[in-house]
């Protein structure tokens, strides 16, 4: 279309293509480029004419297969973000699929550092090991 595009890569987003149209407005063209279902952990973008058709192709690099998280459409990695303990700090809690069960990414110790109430509600590792959704943290009083 003759307009320069800005291509963005990042965590938790699709590879995103933005363009400034002739009116000077920023337009999201991600869907037009067929990239609207590419949410991931993107950390690199390069442009190269791979198939020698005269058009630049978008190459994206993301977290590899050796990473702990194995996200698919059926078993996504999920991040819950809120100020769960109302201390004016954002508390991200990530769950991922581990052999068919959703589990918190952070260890009990790491979650206790972030949300100390967890230590009081999950005194034993065995009870914390049963946590497989954000709702399982409801006994802590800050999850709906």
Please name every model-derived segment:
Residues 1-144:
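Acidic, glycine/proline-rich Ca2+-coordinating loop motifs
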């Amino acid at each position: 279309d003759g307009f320069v595009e800005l291509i963005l890569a990042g965590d938790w987003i699709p590879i995103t293509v933005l363009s400034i149209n002739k009116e000077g407005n920023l337009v999201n063209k991600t869907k037009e480029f067929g990239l609207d279902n590419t949410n991931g952990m993107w950390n690199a973008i390069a442009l190269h004419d791979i198939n020698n058709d005269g058009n630049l192709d978008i190459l994206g690099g993301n977290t590899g297969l050796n990473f702990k998280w194995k996200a698919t459409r059926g078993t996504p990695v999920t991040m819950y973000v809120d100020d769960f303990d109302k201390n004016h700090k954002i508390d991200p809690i990530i769950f991922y699929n581990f052999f068919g069960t959703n589990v918190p990414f952070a260890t009990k110790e790491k979650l206790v550092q972030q949300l100390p109430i967890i230590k009081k509600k999950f005194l034993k590792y065995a009870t914390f090991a049963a946590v497989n959704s954000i709702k399982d943290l409801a006994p802590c009083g800050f999850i709906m």
